[in-house]
């Protein structure tokens, strides 16, 4: 999980979701997991 100031989709399978006020990117590729903060 990478923590970034700006999260964005890297590939077509990346999904932006909001969980508990935080923005996360979940993907089938574990390298694409990102969290904001």
UniProtKB/Swiss-Prot annotation:
One of its GO terms (molecular function) is structural constituent of ribosome. The keyword Chaperone does not apply. It is found in: Plastid. It comes from the Eukaryota. The keyword Transferase does not apply. PROSITE patterns: RIBOSOMAL_L36 (PS00828). InterPro entries: Ribosomal_bL36, Ribosomal_bL36_sp. Keywords: Plastid, Ribonucleoprotein, Ribosomal protein. Its main location: plastid. One of its GO terms (cellular component) is ribonucleoprotein complex. GO terms for biological process: translation. Belongs to the bacterial ribosomal protein bL36 family. HAMAP family: Ribosomal_bL36. This is Large ribosomal subunit protein bL36c. It comes from Cuscuta gronovii.
């Amino acid at each position: 999980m990478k923590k970034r100031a700006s999260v964005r989709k890297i590939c077509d399978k990346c999904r932006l979701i909001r969980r508990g006020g935080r923005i996360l990117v979940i993907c089938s590729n574990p390298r694409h997991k990102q969290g904001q903060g």
